[in-house]
Curated annotation (Swiss-Prot):
Pfam families attached to this UniProt entry: Ribosomal_S8 (PF00410)
Source species of the chain: Saccharolobus solfataricus (strain ATCC 35092 / DSM 1617 / JCM 11322 / P2)
Protein known as: Small ribosomal subunit protein uS8
Key words of the record: Ribonucleoprotein, Ribosomal protein, RNA-binding, rRNA-binding
Classification lineage: Archaea, Thermoproteota, Thermoprotei, Sulfolobales, Sulfolobaceae
Role played: One of the primary rRNA binding proteins, it binds directly to 16S rRNA central domain where it helps coordinate assembly of the platform of the 30S subunit.
Gene of this entry: rps8
Family label: Belongs to the universal ribosomal protein uS8 family.
Length: 133
């Protein structure tokens, strides 16, 4: 089986399991980027605990779902965002979030993976990876 975009597979798996009201989701293949995105989602309160399982091939991640994700998905192509663009909320950011106060854009910055709100607070830019609300 070929996995082209592990982050897109992970976010789609979380969304599908939330819509089926499952208590947990199994994400495969595991990657450092997916784990960092899950840490941001956990910090913002969208998912519960998660655990990496090494199966000898590509690894799995088991995520406990809290039922708080209404929609999540990848942003493709991955847009670069400057600090000023995160504050101004340009059109493509408005496209993914229902409101200015609801949801987060997950951004990869030079300081690591974080939400767009935290990146704006730290005054750094980055690349938009995905959205959650």
């Amino acid at each position: 089986m070929v996995f082209v975009n592990p982050l897109a597979n992970a976010l789609t798996s979380i969304y599908n399991n939330e819509m089926r009201r499952n208590k947990q989701a199994i994400i495969m293949p595991a990657s450092k980027l997916v784990i960092n995105v899950l840490r941001v989602m956990q910090k913002e309160g969208y998912v519960g605990e998660f655990e990496y399982i090494d199966d000898g091939r590509w690894g799995k991640i088991t995520v406990q779902l809290l039922g708080r994700v209404n929609k999540c998905g990848p942003i493709t192509p991955r847009y670069p965002l400057s600090y000023r663009q995160m504050i101004a909320l340009p059109d493509y950011v408005r496209r993914y979030l229902p409101s200015k106060e609801i949801g987060i854009i997950i951004v990869s910055t030079s300081k690591g993976v974080m939400s767009h709100k935290e990146a704006a607070r730290l005054r750094i830019g980055g690349v938009a990876l995905g959205y959650v609300y």
